[in-house]
Regions:
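Active-site-proximal helix/loop segments of hydrolytic enzymes
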Residues: 1-156
Length: 156
């Protein structure tokens, strides 16, 4: 065991080699403004669609990534994780968004990138240092994954 940094682009390769059934990329945001707060979850933007941050489509939106093969499942896991965070933490909920993050583009399994809060927000930074809050975060994420799995079992 070692603590080695793996680049965002490499993380999908690690998941693919492991033949992962699901990929959950957890992050904490930071912003220039100390008032920014809340959590948000991202699914890979489908081909020909504009991302949340750039709502006007461009020619780059026509590119298809390996991860786009999982579009329905990407959306489903993103929904269930965000819903579980709302139920477990309350908010503020910044919502479900679409982006072409490098960590999601080349996944061969469903994937989601979740921003768990802003460490530049004093109250959030304080909460994150608390083991009880981190346990609450972990439980919420677990609940979201379980809800996703149950939904898959009903569909298949």
């Amino acid at each position: 065991d070692s603590d080695v940094y793996i680049s965002l682009a490499q993380r999908s390769k690690v998941a693919n080699r492991a033949k992962a059934d699901l990929f959950v990329s957890l992050h904490f945001n930071a912003a220039g403004s100390t008032s920014a707060s809340g959590f948000e979850s991202y699914a890979l933007t489908p081909q020909y669609q504009a991302s949340s941050k750039y709502p006007r489509p461009t020619s780059k939106d026509a590119k298809r990534y390996i991860g786009n093969a999982q579009d329905p499942w990407n959306t489903l896991i993103t929904y269930h994780l965000e819903r579980a965070l709302v139920q477990g933490l309350g908010g503020p909920d910044r919502g479900i968004k679409r982006a072409r993050w490098s960590v999601l583009k080349d996944l061969e399994c469903p994937g989601v990138l979740t921003e768990l809060g802003f460490v530049s927000h004093a109250e959030t930074a304080k909460k994150v240092r608390s083991p009880a809050f981190r346990q609450k975060l972990a439980q919420s994420l677990y609940n979201g994954i379980v809800a996703y799995r149950k939904r898959l079992q009903r569909i298949q």
